[in-house]
Amino acid sequence: MTKYVFVTGGVVSSIGKGIVAASLGRLLKSRGYSVTILKLDPYINVDPGTMSPFQHGEVFVTNDGAETDLDLGHYERFTDTDVSKLNNVTTGSIYQSVINKERRGDYMGGTVQVIPHITNEIKERIRRVAHDTNPDVVIVEVGGTVGDIESLPFLEAIRQFRKDVGRENVLYIHVTYILHIPTAGEMKTKPTQHSVKELRSIGIQPDILVCRSDRPLSVGIKDKISEFCDVPVRAVITCQDAQTIYAVPLNLEREGLAHQAITLLGLEQRQPDLRDWEILVDRICNPSRAVTIAIVGKYVRLSDAYISVVEALRHAAVALDAEVKVEWVSAEAVEERGAGYFLNNVDGAVVPGGFGSRGIDGKVSAIEFSRGHRLPFLGLCLGMQCSVIEWARHTAGLAANSTEFDPQTPNPVISLLPEQADVVDLGGTMRLGLWPCRLQEGTLAHRLYGETLVYERHRHRYEFNNAYRKAIIEAGFQISGASPDERLVEIIELADHPYFIATQFHPEFKSRPNKPHPLFFGLVRAALERKETERLPASPAPVPLPSAV
């Protein structure tokens, strides 16, 4: 029988429910249990694909082409398991499904209501994940904060779920925050008490409390929380702020989170194997050197908009016994002050993906600087498209652009994918998900990957215009990767540059702490070589971690 763990949050938003859920997944997998993690998002959007990065952060793309919440990236990175469209459910998708059923007449003329129709649909989505993946444990993160009106249908659904599948098969974990008042020198539990009271008023009594704090909880504080929240002291878990998110599983293991969860679910207690994860965290926290890499983007005011890029850089750095210091550079600021002002003192640069014309000239300027000053460079999606525009303007002397930014440009070096010509809706209609890419032997990309056929995740509507293919090759660029039918250019690179490579896909989505992505490894390695002269490994040396169950 599959077991279910529901993770809710209280007191404040962005409290770290996703990291707690992902950490528990890691701890269970270290004991040999198979796990999948599901995110329930209370917003009415069908998916986050059309949401502003400033409001939502990164849109994480899965192998099957789902545009999902960034927490799914944490799930994949912590558990080393691919997730799918089934692992992200929104209020919008629930209502869309229920309304479609009503229009088809599935409810036989009945009045459609939140209870039972919406709650039943939510429960069905949870069961579907369990049915399709057949894990030992399904961990469900409930988005939002207890007390939010948007979350009520989800909370009612998970309340009912325990009755449906049996109390012994369901566990409720509530993540809360313990405030410290510096002037009083005290830690305050009252917000946590009120949060649990709110949860209990819905009919959910948490089994475990995970208490975020900037310092350890004293025995007295744990006793107080236990007394007022009706949770055993052993189930009051400290989750202290950590130097790196990858240390959280180890901290929660020391606090006994997994032991308590396994006991309450009636599973067999097994000895965890976290030795390799401990090595990983030690290398993250104690690097022998550092390198600075600029991320030149449109959404740098919210670093979560590029969270997978940052994590991919960190994964590569760990494999090289280094730390990456990220320099955030606004593409619009580059337009005002010039690329040199921001890039003169960095060791490498990344131009990530995005949409729209704002800041494009700044990205192009940053790419021109990187090319001309031999600065290690990696372009991602829009970053590749801007690399082509930069070449066309400054090497070929063309008044070039993308038709996304200028539909009337005389030299459309980037143009709309043919299959996108008649697309009207924006949501879920791009080229999405995992697609094959064939690499040219002898190229930098081929050396880094070490294989000829690779699969990468995509999210784009525009592509390199093949009418300019011959010209870009004559100008010195190599097309080192393309779709197997040779129609879509996937990777371009410069052979006479220390490291200049750009991709139409998003390699950051496939990077893992123990398996850095080859292209990010290559960038960080080139940046280190620029900074120092010592010999470095020639290929990514994965940090060993327990294999996926």
Curated annotation (Swiss-Prot):
A GO MF label: glutaminase activity
Catalytic activity: UTP + L-glutamine + ATP + H2O = CTP + L-glutamate + ADP + phosphate + 2 H(+); L-glutamine + H2O = L-glutamate + NH4(+); UTP + NH4(+) + ATP = CTP + ADP + phosphate + 2 H(+)
Positions bound to ATP: S14, I15, G16, K17, G18, I19, D71
Residues annotated for UTP binding in this entry: S13, K188, T189, K190, P191, T192, Q193, K224
Residues binding Mg(2+): D71, E141
GO cellular component: cytosol
Enzyme class: ligase
Pathway membership: Pyrimidine metabolism; CTP biosynthesis via de novo pathway; CTP from UDP: step 2/2
Keywords: ATP-binding, Glutamine amidotransferase, Ligase, Magnesium, Metal-binding, Nucleotide-binding, Pyrimidine biosynthesis
InterPro entries recorded: Class_I_gatase-like, CTP_synthase, CTP_synthase_N, GATASE, GATase1_CTP_Synthase, P-loop_NTPase
PROSITE patterns: GATASE_TYPE_1
The keyword Ligase is annotated on this UniProt entry: yes
Residues bound to CTP: S13, D148, I149, E150, K188, T189, K190, P191, T192, Q193, K224
Residues annotated as signal peptide: none
Listed NCBIfam families: PRK05380.1, PyrG
Further facts: CTPSs have evolved a hybrid strategy for distinguishing between UTP and CTP. The overlapping regions of the product feedback inhibitory and substrate sites recognize a common feature in both compounds, the triphosphate moiety. To differentiate isosteric substrate and product pyrimidine rings, an additional pocket far from the expected kinase/ligase catalytic site, specifically recognizes the cytosine and ribose portions of the product inhibitor.
Assembly: Homotetramer.
Function comment: Catalyzes the ATP-dependent amination of UTP to CTP with either L-glutamine or ammonia as the source of nitrogen. Regulates intracellular CTP levels through interactions with the four ribonucleotide triphosphates.
Family, as annotated: Belongs to the CTP synthase family.
Name of the protein this chain belongs to: CTP synthase
Organism name: Gloeobacter violaceus (strain ATCC 29082 / PCC 7421)
